[in-house]
Amino acid sequence: MKIQNKTVLVTGGCSGIGKIMARRCLEKGAAQVIVWDINEAAIADTVKELSSLGTVKGFKADIASPASVDEAASTTKAACGAVDILINNAGIIANNKIFAEQTDRDIDLTMDIDAKGAMYVTLRFIGDMRSRGVGHICNITSSAGMLALPKMSLYTAAKWAAIGWSESLRLEMEREKSPVKVTTIAPYFINTGMFDGIRSFFRILPPEEVARKALRAIELDLGYRGINFPSHFIRLMQGIFPHSWFNFLFGDLCGLYTVMDHFTGRKKD
């Protein structure tokens, strides 16, 4: 779907690749861009920063809360009309603890934001898209959703769920011959601050590159887009290599199983 003259909603749109995608959509001629974020000050700053590029509006939303999503969706529809392109981008990494040290709160927070949040948001807009016969849903997941990673068990679990749901949603739309498109984006780790401290054999991705390729995938109506080497070949290698070989290649040689050992994450203001 072409972004020009479309109304685009980006969750987590006030930092990282969400903010970059919001900016790029305006540069591509979007009719209006809507950013959702949990941080009201960040919303005000983002709207002010991007307003010179076009029409941009921001609303507070906690995507972990169905009630908050309901309120934000109603406000968005009343103020901005129908959403043509939904980019489910918001996400977190709670910590780098092993699973045995996690709490119920850690589990709920990660699953609610990284897996269920995109589902809550999509439910509020997909009905309108189907009845209008136009729409594109882009889900930003992660190559971690195809791997087992120590000290990242909650994040990988949520991203496995997100990929499975996103791909299933795409197939449902295709089976009913709906014009509504679904794109799953699975990038490797991104240099946005969210992954600060990670040490990787593979290249940490510049956020501008991820944003550019994600938006290009929307414009080309791609169903799936992996970004960087691991995202392209993980499934193939898991399918053809014995489990011990895969662990040796990615865990021992490439060091993927120790990437979280020095994780610090984005510093809080």
PLM regions and their residue ranges:
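Residue(s) in the substrate-gating loop at a strand-loop-helix junction
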Residues: 142
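Active-site helix of classical SDR
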Residues: 122, 158
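Canonical Rossmann dinucleotide-binding motif of NAD(H)/NADP(H)-dependent dehydrogenases/reductases
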Residues: 2-34
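Conserved glycine-rich Rossmann-like NAD(P)H-binding loop of the short-chain dehydrogenase/reductase
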Residues: 30-45
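The beta1-alpha1 cofactor-binding region of Rossmann-like NAD(H)/NADP(H)-dependent oxidoreductases
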Residues: 40-41, 60-71, 104
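Substrate-binding pocket helix/loop in short-chain dehydrogenase/reductase
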Residues: 97-99, 103-109
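SDR active-site lid
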Residues: 171-231
